[in-house]
UniProtKB/Swiss-Prot annotation:
Swiss-Prot/TrEMBL keywords: Apoptosis
Record PANTHER family: BCL-2-MODIFYING FACTOR
Reported function: May play a role in apoptosis. Isoform 1 seems to be the main initiator.
Entry similarity comment: Belongs to the Bcl-2 family.
Tissue localization of expression: Isoform 1 is mainly expressed in B-lymphoid cells. Isoform 2 and isoform 3 are mainly expressed in B-CLL and normal B-cells.
Name of this chain's protein: Bcl-2-modifying factor
Disulfide linkage: none
GO cellular component, as recorded: cytosol; mitochondrial outer membrane; myosin complex; plasma membrane
Gene Ontology biological process terms, A to Z: anoikis; cellular response to UV; negative regulation of autophagy; positive regulation of apoptotic process; positive regulation of protein-containing complex assembly; positive regulation of release of cytochrome c from mitochondria
Glycoprotein found in the keyword field: no
Encoding gene (name): BMF
Binding partners and assembly: Interacts with MCL1, BCL2, BCL2L1/BCL-Xl, BCL2A1 and BCL2L2/BCL-w. Interacts with the myosin V actin motor complex through its binding to DLC2.
Motif BH3, residue numbers: 133-147
InterPro entries, per database record: BMF (IPR028192)
Amino acid sequence: MEPSQCVEELEDDVFQPEDGEPVTQPGSLLSADLFAQSLLDCPLSRLQLFPLTHCCGPGLRPTSQEDKATQTLSPASPSQGVMLPCGVTEEPQRLFYGNAGYRLPLPASFPAVLPIGEQPPEGQWQHQAEVQIARKLQCIADQFHRLHVQQHQQNQNRVWWQILLFLHNLALNGEENRNGAGPR
């Protein structure tokens, strides 16, 4: 299978509209075509070290749309349901609030929608490649952070199990410990 076919067959639930969300037009900045890249668009497309996950939502979106896959509720509302990734038991400390995490500055000359069939100037291809690289780097950072948090929680769980096992053995073998059962 050629790499271009792999990229075309890549499906991700990030780019699928949810119920009630507006569907974007094929030429708009929010369409999935912006994220699908051929080998000519970006030479780094062969180097997909990490698969796209639902942490990698589109970075360019109106403020009316929200990325439900990466939302966490603020610490001020613990009584409501907390949306956390699988395996995470503690709510992470938020680095960004609102849309600050996925707003990217665009130059004033950047058109909102290109006419169908028209190629953007060379400088805009570079800008698009930079935006895509930034998104992939953000994905890698999110995955690293998620793995770090999971590893930290697993280490904490191991410590608690070791303490529990020690107390269990101490309670069951208390008589032997008190009588001074010598070295074996």
